[in-house]
Amino acid sequence: MKRRLSTLLAAFVFVALVTLTASAQSVLMGGVGKSDITPPIGTPLAGYGARRAQPSTGVHDPTEARAVIIDNGVEKIALVSVDHLGFDHGMVERIRAIASPATHILPDHIFVMSSHTHSGGGAYMEMLPLLANVLAGKFDPKIRAFYEERTAEAIIAANKNMKRVRIAIGAGEALGISRFRSTWPPNGPVDPEVGVIRIDSVETGKPVAILMNFAAHPTVLGSENMTFSADFVGYARNALEKMIGGDVMATFANGAQGTIAPRAFQGDDGWQRSENVGTILAAEVFKVVAMIKPRDFVDIKLARTPLTLKIVPTSVFPTTMSYPPSYETEINAISFDNRFAFVAIPGELGSILNFQVKDRGKLLGFEKTFILGLTNDALGYIITEDEYRHKTYESTISLFGPAFGSFVANESFQLLERLRPVEKKTP
């Protein structure tokens, strides 16, 4: 009798645990947070060598870290966008070290996505001082730590703001605001696709966060600008938030922008042109936001591959320079509901390789595959061997040799393969 009672009790506990687990998994939680990562005025801007590391003169609009956390009870991820030229992997690792214990998000579930604005803060590049001094000014460890700590603050703030949410994902096209900028191939491909993640509050039914994913260099503002700015990205966020209304936070993730520039629009100055590009992008995102239908729950899968790389000298990086013997980084992918895949590229993927990765995602059964550029690192340009051989501008700042582009593409294919939708067998 005692054995039977023990067996029944064990069965009851097992069923209860399964029920509780299923219940926990059926509740989707989300949170948003942001922080100001604008360094002190006088800090050099990062992006244009023509500035010659001169000190910044002011703040036009704050550069920010904006974090979105999604937790389905099984996987908890943070997507944090920073208005910056590009955080390197060491910075990302420190952000994770600060934010992970405070949020209980696994370190490799924190994704730091640099917008690549050329009007963000400098003085942060520790490796390759010759390049660092030209692009971002003299290294200052206190400024670097400032960026890291402020970005972690955004993630921690989002974690304190968790609520029940629903999620919707979709895509549209922002035509005419980007162009192929490289010299090879002639009339190279442009990807106008806009990916959108919308997160709604269950309580209010209104959006609390919109993530837009679009490929273009935030370089509407030229080297003559000496004030901090998010470039067209800031205008896009502001316009989208006004269009939606309420207490919504818009955030931006760049795509495969390695060979893509914004198309110049009419305007009296760079600010008007930035506003024009940002407003057009926001209008397309708004269309998608209004069209997509939210779900109460989303399945989340992740895949990660650590990479050990070796720098290959170029005309910009001659053999006389001192290089680290190896460089550690990573490449990642996320899938939602076996329908939408996001490949997190640790650098500036070229447009040709972008289409190769997206086509492979479609072949593997994903409804849409998106690229999160400059995510968790900023490795420079990632282009095809053909582009490298034609000595394009991008090839001069392609750090890991002519075969690096195909290597990254193949690693992306393998990540997508690991996450590919499983076909349900009919009985």
Outline where the language-model segments fall.
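Sec/Tat signal peptide C-region and signal peptidase I cleavage site
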Residues: 20-24
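Anionic-ligand-binding alpha/beta catalytic cores of soluble enzymes and soluble regulatory domains
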Residues: 281
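Conserved beta-alpha junction segments in alpha/beta enzyme cores
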Residues: 25-113, 117-249, 253-276, 289, ...
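Bacterial N-terminal signal peptides
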Residues: 9-19
